[in-house]
C-alpha cells in the first residue's frame, strides 16, 4: 500500500479508456526513446563534426538539449503511471515538474526567436555573419534563452504552488500543467490567471516579434535576389526553422492564449501530448532529414564505426 500525504495530487492520466492503454503505452515509449536518441545523436554529431561547428548548429544543439530535458520532464512519470495503479505525485514533485516544464518551454520559445535572427543574418548579411554571430555572441544568445525560460519558471511556479487547494486533488491531466492544476483551487484565481496570461503573451510576443521581423527582412532580401539558385538556398536555410516554429507556437497559442471557454480537458490533453511528446521527436528529424551537412556527418560517423568494428573483428 502506498503512503500518501494530504498535500499530494492524483494525476488522472492521458486516457479514460483503459482498453487502448497497452497500445498507447507502447507508442509513447517508442516515441520517447526515439526522441531522446535522435536529440542525443544530433548533439553528438554537432560536437564531433567540424563542418557543424557553426552558429546555426550551435543553437540547434541547444534546441536538442532543451527538447531532451523537456520530454524527460513529463513522459517518464506518464509511463510509470500507465503501468501503476497509484498515480500519485507529491506536492513538491508537482512543483518541480511545473518549474522544469515552464523553464524548458520558455527557453525554447526564446531560442526559436534567436534562431530566426540567425537565419536573418545568414541570408541578409552573409559577409558579416562571422562577426555578427561569433562564438561569444552565440554563447550570450543561448544564455539569454535559458535565462528567459528560467525566469518564467521562477515567477509562476511559486505563485501556483501557493494557491490554496482543497477538496478534490485529482488533476485531470497526465502531468502538472498549470491550467489543469488551477482548476483544483478553492480560492479566486482570476488575478493569478491574468498574470499568467500576461506572462505567456509576453513569452510568445517577444520571440514572435523577432521571428516576424527577421522573416520580413529575409523575404525582402530573397525577392531582390537575381538568381533562382540563391532564392532556393535561402528558402532551404529557413524552411526547417519555420516548420518547427509553426508546430510549437501553434500548440502553445492554443494552450496558453486561447480563452478557456474554447478548451475541453480531453482536447487539452491531446494538444499537450503533441507538443510535450511528439514535438521533441520531430525537431531533430525536421532539421536532419532536410540537411545535407547533418546527413553527411551521420554517414561519416557511421562509416568510422563500421571501419573500427571491421578492424576489431579482423584482429580477433
UniProtKB/Swiss-Prot annotation:
It is a multi-pass membrane protein. Glycans are attached at residue 3. GO terms for biological process: detection of chemical stimulus involved in sensory perception of smell. GO terms for cellular component: plasma membrane. Residues 1-22, 77-97, 156-192, 257-269 are extracellular. The chain crosses the membrane at residues 23-46, 55-76, 98-117, 137-155, 193-216, 234-256, 270-289. GO terms for molecular function: G protein-coupled receptor activity; olfactory receptor activity. Disulfide bonds join 94-186. SUPFAM superfamilies: Family A G protein-coupled receptor-like (SSF81321). InterPro entries: GPCR_Rhodpsn (IPR000276), GPCR_Rhodpsn_7TM (IPR017452), Olfact_rcpt (IPR000725). The keyword Cell membrane applies. Residues 47-54, 118-136, 217-233, 290-316 are cytoplasmic. Odorant receptor. This is Olfactory receptor 2T11. It comes from Homo sapiens (Human). The gene is OR2T11.
Amino acid at each position: 500500500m502506498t503512503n500518501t500525504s494530504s498535500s499530494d495530487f492524483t494525476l488522472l492520466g492521458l486516457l479514460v479508456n483503459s482498453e487502448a492503454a497497452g497500445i498507447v503505452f507502447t507508442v509513447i515509449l517508442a516515441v520517447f526513446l526515439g526522441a531522446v536518441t535522435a536529440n542525443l545523436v544530433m548533439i553528438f554529431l554537432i560536437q564531433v563534426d567540424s563542418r557543424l561547428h557553426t552558429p546555426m548548429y550551435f543553437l540547434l544543439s541547444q534546441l536538442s538539449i532543451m527538447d531532451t530535458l523537456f520530454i524527460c520532464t513529463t513522459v517518464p512519470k506518464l509511463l510509470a503511471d500507465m503501468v501503476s495503479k497509484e498515480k500519485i505525485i507529491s506536492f513538491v514533485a508537482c512543483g518541480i515538474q511545473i518549474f522544469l516544464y515552464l523553464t524548458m518551454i520558455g527557453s525554447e520559445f526564446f531560442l526559436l526567436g534567436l534562431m530566426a535572427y540567425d537565419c536573418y543574418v545568414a541570408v541578409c548579411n552573409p559577409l558579416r555573419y562571422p562577426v555578427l554571430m561569433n562564438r561569444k555572441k552565440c554563447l550570450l544568445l543561448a544564455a539569454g534563452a535559458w535565462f528567459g525560460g528560467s525566469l518564467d519558471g521562477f515567477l509562476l511556479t511559486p505563485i501556483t504552488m501557493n494557491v490554496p487547494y482543497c477538496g478534490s486533488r485529482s488533476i485531470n491531466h497526465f502531468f502538472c500543467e498549470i491550467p489543469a492544476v488551477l482548476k483544483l483551487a478553492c480560492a479566486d484565481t482570476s488575478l493569478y490567471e491574468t498574470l499568467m496570461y500576461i506572462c505567456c503573451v509576453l513569452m510568445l510576443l517577444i520571440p514572435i516579434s523577432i521571428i516576424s521581423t527577421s522573416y520580413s527582412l529575409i523575404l525582402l532580401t530573397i525577392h531582390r535576389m537575381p538568381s533562382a539558385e540563391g532564392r532556393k538556398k535561402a528558402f532551404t536555410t529557413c524552411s526547417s526553422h519555420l516548420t518547427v516554429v509553426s508546430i510549437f507556437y501553434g500548440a502553445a497559442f492554443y494552450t496558453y492564449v486561447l480563452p478557456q471557454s474554447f478548451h475541453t480537458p480531453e482536447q487539452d490533453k491531446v494538444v499537450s501530448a503533441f507538443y510535450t511528446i511528439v514535438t521533441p521527436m520531430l525537431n531533430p528529424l525536421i532539421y536532419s532529414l532536410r540537411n545535407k551537412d547533418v546527413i553527411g556527418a551521420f554517414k561519416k560517423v557511421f562509416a568510422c564505426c563500421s571501419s573500427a568494428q571491421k578492424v576489431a573483428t579482423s584482429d580477433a
